[in-house]
Every structure is written in C-alpha cells, then in structure tokens.
C-alpha cells in the first residue's frame, strides 16, 4: 500500500515554488499570531526530521472507520488515515482500483509532514500514469510561515501546473501582502517554476506586475532577475541597480549589475564567484563610460580568494583597483577617513601555520584613493615580504625567533593643486565646481630598499596559583640594503648598508589575590592583581636607518607591557623603565559576570629615551613626543555594569608633566526591551606635539522601540573641535508579522575637505519572499553599535595574537 502515497511529494513541491524565492536572512516572527495559519492535524505523527529522511524505507499504514469493496477496489470510509514516517494523509473517503491505478480521495483531504501542511476538497488521479489533480487547496510551510491557496493543481510525473494560486507569510485573515499568479508551471526534475501574469499586492493594491518570470523551487540555483536596489542622493541623483543572476555551473556563477544614476549615466558591473574543493574566490568589476559629472570613463576591479594547498599552507589574495582618486568618494557612501581609507591595499601571498611556527611569503601594493592628497601619504609597498616565526618550550624555558625580510618600494609623488580662493584672502571655496588638479610636477622621488629583521629570544615563564614571573632576553638585529636615491635622502647619512644590533631584556611579574565579599545582598569574588614590568634596552643611534612601515603605538594600557613603542622594525626605542599597574575585578558569584573592573598603571622612566621617529623620510610615519626621565601619563581603564541593561566604560590618561589629560573616552549603553538600545560616547585626544586638541567628538545613537511595530533609529555624530556634524541619521522602522519597512535620511561628511552629502534610503522587506530598495541594515549596523544585539557579544581580536598576515616582532609571549 506504500504506492498510494506516491502523489504526496508533488503537491508539496508545487506549493513550495513561490517561497523558494525567500531571502537568506533570518526573520523575526515574534509579531505573528501564536496559532499557525494551518494548525497541525489530529492523529498526525509528530514532526521528526529523522523520520523524514527514512520515509522511503518505512511501511504505509492505512486505517478507517469502515472498509468495503473488493481486494482490487478497496473503499475506506470515515476518518481515513494513511501514515508513513512523518507523513500523514487524511480524508473522509478513499476509493482505490489496484488494477487500473485510479484513486479518489474526497472530503476534508489533509496532508502533513515535517515542513508542510495542506488541506483540499478532493484529490484524484492514476498511479500507473502518474497523473493527479488536487482541487481547492490551502497550504502552509511550517518553518517559513508561508501560506496560501490554489484553485487546483494538475500533475503529470515531474511536471505540474498550479492554477489561481497565492502566497504570503502574513496571517490569512489579514494578508498585508501576497503574490497572485493565475498560472504557474513547475518542473520538479529541472528544479524551477515559471509564473505568468504574477502580481505582488500590498493590501488589495497591485504594486508590481510580472508578465513572466522563472524561479527556483529547490536549492538549485536558476538564472534570472533578483530584486532591485534603488536610492536617492545629491551626489548621484536617482540610483537604480538591477541585479541579473547567471547560474553558469554548480560551482561557479555570475551576477550582472547594471546600474543607472541620473546624474552620471549607466554603469555596467559584474560579479563572478567560484568554489571548488579547497578554495573559493570572487571578482567584481564596474565600468562607467563617460561619467557625465567627471567627463571621463570610470571603473573598478576587486578580487578576493584563497586556495588551501594542504593542511598547513594556504594561498590568499585580495586585489583592489579603481580608475581614479575620486572613485571611492563618488560611488561609496561611507565616511571618508572614518568608514573608509585614503588608499586601497592589494595583497597576494602564501601563508603557513604549524604547531610551533608560522610563515609566509607575500607581496603588497597601495593605491591612492583620496584626490586631496598626493602619493606621499601612501605607505611603502612590500614587494615581496617573507616572514618566519617559531617558538617552543624546553623544560622551564621557552625559546623562539621572529624573522622578516622585505623589499620596499614607493611610487613617486606629484603635486596636487587645490582649488584657488574665489576672493583674494578668502579660504578656499571647495564646492562641486572646484577641481583639484594632479600636476606633472614631481613632488618627491622615492627610492627603494630591503630590510632584514631577526629577533631570537629565550624566556623562563614561571607561575603558581597566585603569581607569575617571566624574565625574557632577546637580541634584535636589523640590516638594510638601500639604493642610492634613498640613501642620499636627508636625514639619512648616505650609508647604503646601515644596520642595528642590540639586546632587549625584560621581566614581567604579577600577583593574584581574591576574596569573597558581599555588597547590597549580592555575593562577589573581588580580585586584586598587581603587575610589574621592567624593560631595559640600550641606546643605539638609528638616525641613519630609514622608516618604511614603522609607526608609534597609540599609548594605552596594553602599551605599558610592550618591549617597544613602535609597530615595525625600523625603530627600537632605548629604555630603562618600570611599569607598575594594578587591576581589580568584582565578579558576581551566582553567574560569574563582571560587575566592575578597574585597571590603572604608569611607566617610571629612569632615563631619557633618545630614539624617536621624528624627522624621518616617510611623511606617513608622523612624529612623536620625546620621552624624558620621569613618569608617563597615568592610564586608567574602567568598566561598570550598573545592572543587566545599563553599562558604562571609561578610559582616561592624565599626564603629570603637563598636568593635562592626554586622552579621555566615556561611553555608556542602555539596553531597551524589544532589542532596543541607546549609546552615548565622548572622545577626546590631545596632540602631544603642540598640546592642541587633536580630536573632540560626541556620538549619540539609538534604536528606540515605540511599540511592538514602530521603532525610531538615529545617530548624531558631532565634532566639537570643528563645530560641525560628521554624520546625522534619522529614520523609522515599521515591523509586522510579514512586512517590514525602513526609511532613513542621512547627512554625512563625504571627503577630507568636509563637504557634506545627503541620501535617502528606503527598504521594503517582504518576510519569506525578498526585499527591495537599499540595504539599510548595512548602514544602521555600522552607525548603531548593537543594532544587531549579537554584535555586542562579539569578542574583538586580541592585539597579542599572531596574525599570519601581520608580522610583528615586538610581541613576545
């Protein structure tokens, strides 16, 4: 009797055809009624994915109140139920003819399995010819909440036709939106459906009409149109993007990205993806012929991919190219200098990791993307770069070596002529009609050079239950081979083969105390963790060494325990200093959560530190404050969880020498119901060279649920120093069981000149179907920390872990 269930998978695939267009993102169904549109049937087996996988091997049980007819023409009457695994078919009457293969199921026909439910008035067909007809259908997709109806379904083998069907994820009694199609042809063998004259309705109003479209009904990808994206901005005008998906093969595909901008013209783009065992990649290209605003062709190419050579080695590449220095500003909407950079990085390399070692060979190149700057602002290219790191314990000792060899090159720079003032003596008026001119006058000719950096070390990490003591001795040798152009560039002395060699000694020690205590009726574990770090590095004159990739670290609590002030190998500071620091934590004993943490520390300098990065040949390296005998700024970090909703944090640096604060950062966060959040932050940094204010900003952002359906979003990011906003976002969100609408108005700084731009973003999300408009999630997730609540619990990358693509010989365990 298993044969009688042969029709069941076919109506299932027909009804699922429209929901196969659903978006990949999870949706919030919390506003939906608790009762399913089509509740489960009495007597049906419980949902069981394992039973669904085994259904073809399980027997079919048939039962009913009465059985009549003959052995070849059985007739079941009253509460007929057919069960196999997770499948259930119920009807009032079932007549079968085992010789001809005909069957008829009438009266309250019901079908259910793990993921699908359906009711119909009648089902009839022939098992031998595999033809079936089901009339007056209502269905529900259990996991997606998708539901709808159809007047009838005709099936012939793997091919079927659905007549006068609908689909929605809304409650059937109040469908805010639904898709109607008078006819849908489905080919289960090929995995696609074809709808004719389909209409998307919002309420009873048709908003989109599709005379013909083809779509997948299973996981197999199909060529076709994706939902469009559109927006409006002062920079590009009306902006419309229509993605066209091309399913080229099971392991690679492409998406055409034609884009129309009313102020610029048509841009042609494409995205190609490939996947194979051991690797994958993606390349995106865009081309805009004769930009109407810039009067020239524009374009970009981006590629990223990797290949696993074996279990230890992986090849990776990331390549970026744009046609001109205005491209990033014109075709992206991030904050220049805040959400994006003034340059693009391209890297190609192979990287290895073993139990005690990491290694890599790579090449890196930079491209300028800020039209207000010249090539002097670019970092040096590393072409190529090889590194090897090794560390291993030997009894109570640990030994290791950090090694790097790099060839540095740099593009020559040319003067950029800024716009002229409109009135003599007036500040530059840099509106959209002003033009920066890249001249042919060479500003600086850069040479090239190679660097070898070796840093072997041995340490003796000792520890107990309440203490640790780790002395470390390292030797650092750095040698260069420079071309004549670079060697003769001041302040270098002309030596083409300078070198530096010096020892580095340190002792890191700490204690751990804890006690059980109680405060306001809550039990805590209170810790006290004093720490001492002594560092000695003798002075070496390094004025004849170039500066390629070295910058001063930003002074922070972590900097108190490093053996150098610099990120790279071009400088190694001399030091005779002692760090004294302490941390105290209050941990709730019932759940282990940290109620309060306080950390404070200071460096005592026993002598002047004579090595600096000042007056280097590299403009990007910047400058730093000299360090004299005495004390560093106090560094204090604090985090306080007022309650489970409200938390505060602060970082403060006070300099006893200038009797001023070097840095202050205050932040607070309050979690609201329904995933709401309020963030408030203040940031201040002082320029340690001229004692001026370097940065002074306030940042306020929120996601405020007005009620379960409506919420307001916003951000006000303001520079107190410049007395102007950096970004303003205001918007509303409306959410329901099956539809979400988001609208944003955004004003933001778009370039280094401080010019502002405006944009309007609107997105419609038809839950369980798709979304169209601009991707507002990306904007809000960047602007409002906690817009996705899970983002609050992501662990930031540690600055003490080894990144295979970021050699740093200054990090010694």
Swiss-Prot record:
Region forming the signal peptide: 1-22
Location(s) in or outside the cell: Cell outer membrane
One GO CC term, this protein: cell outer membrane
Swiss-Prot/TrEMBL GO biological process terms: Gram-negative-bacterium-type cell outer membrane assembly; lipopolysaccharide transport
InterPro entries: LipoPS_assembly_LptD, LptD, LptD_C, OstA-like_N
Ranges in coiled-coil conformation: none
Matches recorded under Pfam families: LptD (PF04453), LptD_N (PF03968)
Keywords: Cell outer membrane, Membrane, Signal
Signal as UniProt keyword: yes
Main location class: membrane
Record note on quaternary structure: Component of the lipopolysaccharide transport and assembly complex. Interacts with LptE and LptA.
Family: Belongs to the LptD family.
Described purpose of this protein according to its UniProt entry: Together with LptE, is involved in the assembly of lipopolysaccharide (LPS) at the surface of the outer membrane.
PANTHER family in the cross-refs: LPS-ASSEMBLY PROTEIN, LPS-ASSEMBLY PROTEIN LPTD
Name of this chain's protein: LPS-assembly protein LptD
Annotated organism of origin: Xanthomonas oryzae pv. oryzae (strain MAFF 311018)
Gene: lptD
